[in-house]
Regions:
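Conserved, single-site charged/polar hotspot
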Residues: 1-184
Length: 184
């Protein structure tokens, strides 16, 4: 699958030229994952991020959306695709995996932190999805007691919660199941 990316970052245009450019989805993800979560994160956290990022990208690629390389869509830094072997490994080991609900690719959101509470999408935006459930997030709460992180929109995967859970030995598929209720 291919995805069209409007390049706005100087480091990306220096390598790939002016956008939008057409990129192989899996190669694109190799530049997204280390831009969104620390390369030094536990491998299960990197895998969870890879699946969430792939799901987000596939949903938009299927709709013909041209994404950009900022956090308005997903952060993408082309130079990191080659200098982040652990993120690349996570992308390769989860190749093709996307989250679905009722047989459809979900509209997959994630953020740095949810402040200790997973939010319904309807609490933040105009549309409610059944796989975003309002509930306490013990992983995000535990992570934030170790390091202060400002919460963002709080819908979907919390990156600090994901990293904390992975360090405790939680597999990536269980991390994803917690943040995307009922999605497979």
């Amino acid at each position: 699958m291919k995805i069209f990316v409007k390049l706005t970052r100087a480091e990306n245009t220096a390598l790939l030229g002016a956008g939008p450019v057409e990129l192989d989805l899996e190669e694109y993800l190799c530049g997204v994952v280390p831009s969104e979560i620390y390369e030094s994160s536990h491998m299960e956290a990197l895998k969870a991020q890879a699946v969430a990022a792939r799901t987000f990208a596939v949903k938009r690629a299927m709709a013909g959306t041209v994404v950009d390389d900022t956090t308005s869509f997903q952060a993408y830094r082309a130079p990191l695709a080659e200098s982040s072997p652990r993120s690349r490994q996570a992308v390769v080991e989860t190749a093709g995996q996307v989250l679905t609900y009722g047989g459809e690719v979900i509209d997959c959101f994630y953020s740095a932190s949810n402040g200790g509470t997973c939010k319904r999408s309807g609490e933040v935006w105009s549309r409610d999805y059944p796989y975003y459930v309002n509930k306490p997030d013990p992983w995000d709460t535990a992570a934030r007691t170790e390091k202060s992180t400002n919460p963002s929109h709080g819908v979907g995967l919390s990156q600090v919660g994901c990293m904390w859970a992975a360090k405790q030995g939680v597999p990536y598929n269980e991390i994803l199941a917690f943040y995307y209720s009922g999605a497979a």
